[in-house]
Curated annotation (Swiss-Prot):
Protein keywords: Amino-acid biosynthesis, Cytoplasm, NADP, Oxidoreductase, Proline biosynthesis
Reaction(s) the record says it catalyses: L-glutamate 5-semialdehyde + phosphate + NADP(+) = L-glutamyl 5-phosphate + NADPH + H(+)
Gene name, Swiss-Prot/TrEMBL: proA
PANTHER family listed in its UniProt record: DELTA-1-PYRROLINE-5-CARBOXYLATE SYNTHASE, GLUTAMATE SEMIALDEHYDE DEHYDROGENASE
Protein family per UniProt: Belongs to the gamma-glutamyl phosphate reductase family.
Localization per Swiss-Prot or TrEMBL: Cytoplasm
Range of residues in the leader sequence: none
GO molecular function, one term: glutamate-5-semialdehyde dehydrogenase activity
Protein name: Gamma-glutamyl phosphate reductase
Purpose: Catalyzes the NADPH-dependent reduction of L-glutamate 5-phosphate into L-glutamate 5-semialdehyde and phosphate. The product spontaneously undergoes cyclization to form 1-pyrroline-5-carboxylate.
Length: 418
């Protein structure tokens, strides 16, 4: 069969398997996930052997040390994958939950019940742990999943998927409910994105170029997990010590993640007093500051910021800094350059905090707290499949509930419409 025919077959089988999966009880789904976790840990040696093939190929291709680190699986990371599956098993099952119920004047009882979306396609890049994480969230929420990982992790992804499918076979659950596109050619992705009759949703996880490619080529609805150009605005009433502490955490704790801080905006009324000690503190942490002309008056060691810096997701120890006239200017800047991810105001003015919350439309707006809290676990949602920057169908961290939709249920007693 051609690649197109094989991808179509995978999608058809996933669609058929999704029907059986949607009927599984919470108990069976949890048993499956717990056994999958045990199987991953039991198969640590084999998984590391397959991962070694990907690492060797990556070194030959000249992948950066950072890329190789994302690709690498060791015993600790495999245990982390297993623990993530156990965490998903511990979460409440949203499927079948009746979210609302009301009575009509004619006596009908009308409600809304959560149901799986059906078949979810995940397109992702180098981190092989996504294979297990995405599968767990989709399966727990009653969805079949079709996975297409990066070519650089093909051996690792195949081994992880095979391990999980082995448990499904043992429990009599259709293995096609967890499918991996086995091709490294781009044609495999393109054909997957054409299966609009069989796949209900595509979620791309990776860099900006991958997400743009998926959006431009998909016939299936896409939820974008786009770049994180996250901002923090130091208001005129801000507590300087608090602001500096939050900025350091948001920028330096894990600079390579999407909820790390990338742009700092400072009210002009506090620029002269806030910037010099702040710049000294960040410099001691090896953070490169890039500022506009006004910022550089108070931090002359900062590099000159260009137009490109305001829209940059650095994912490293670089921070773009700008002095703004007021909150209007700060909000305008965020609306122009932001990616709808995470935005912070540091302020002691309640009215300003409320206005910032109302007028900034990102997926998470924070007052006096780090951007790093825009995370499913930190917000109390449990595991997440990613942070959506698309307002339809979900916005912000996507947990189990966000992988479902609702249907109307109606209870009658013989009513007919007049």
């Amino acid at each position: 069969m051609t690649i197109a025919e094989q991808v179509a077959t995978i999608a058809k089988n996933a669609r058929q398997a999704s029907i059986a999966l949607a009927r599984l009880s919470t108990t069976v789904k949890n048993e499956m996930l717990l056994k999958m976790a045990d199987a991953l840990e039991a198969g640590t040696t084999g998984l590391m052997c397959e991962n070694a093939k990907d690492l060797a190929a990556g070194k030959e291709k000249g992948l950066s040390d950072a890329m190789l680190d994302r690709l690498m699986l060791d015993a600790k990371r495999i245990k982390g994958m297993a623990d993530a599956l156990r965490e998903v098993a511990s979460l409440a099952d949203p499927v079948g939950e009746v979210t609302r119920m009301w009575k009509r004047p004619n006596g009908l009882m009308v409600g809304k019940m959560r149901i799986p979306l059906g078949v979810i396609g995940i397109v992702y890049e180098s981190r092989p742990n996504v294979t297990a994480d995405a599968a767990a969230l989709c399966l727990k929420s009653g969805n079949a999943v079709v996975l297409r990982g990066g070519s650089e992790a093909i051996h690792s992804n195949r081994a992880i998927a095979a391990t999980l499918q082995g448990v499904m076979k043992e429990l009599g659950i259709p293995e096609a409910a967890l499918s991996l596109i086995p091709f490294t050619e781009r044609e495999g992705v393109l054909e997957m994105l054409k299966q609009e009759e069989l796949i209900d949703l595509i979620i791309p996880r990776g860099g900006e170029s991958l997400i743009r490619f998926v959006v431009e080529n998909s016939r299936i609805p896409v939820i974008k997990h786009y770049k994180g150009v996250c901002h923090l605005f130091v208001d005129a009433s801000a507590d300087f010590e608090m602001a500096t502490r939050i900025i350091i955490n948001a920028k330096t704790q894990r600079p390579g993640v999407c909820n790390a801080l990338e742009t700092l905006l400072i009210h002009k009324d506090v620029a002269a007093t806030f910037i010099p000690p702040f710049a000294k503190s960040l410099g001691e942490l090896q953070v490169e500051l890039r500022g506009d002309e006004e910022f550089r008056k108070y931090a002359p060691a900062a590099k000159v910021a260009t137009e490109e810096d305001w829209a940059a997701e650095y994912l490293e120890l670089i921070l773009a800094c700008k002095v703004v006239d007021d909150m209007d200017a700060a909000i305008d800047h965020i609306n122009q350059y932001g990616s709808l991810h995470s935005e912070v105001i540091v302020t002691r003015d309640y009215a300003n905090a409320q206005r910032f919350i109302r007028e900034v439309n990102s997926s998470c707006v924070l007052v006096n707290a780090s951007t790093r809290f825009n995370d499913g676990g930190q917000l109390g949602l449990g595991a997440e499949i990613g942070i959506s920057t698309t307002k339809l169908h979900s916005f912000g961290p996507m947990g189990l509930e966000d992988l479902t939709t609702t249907k109307f249920i109606v209870y009658g007693d013989g009513q007919v419409r007049a």
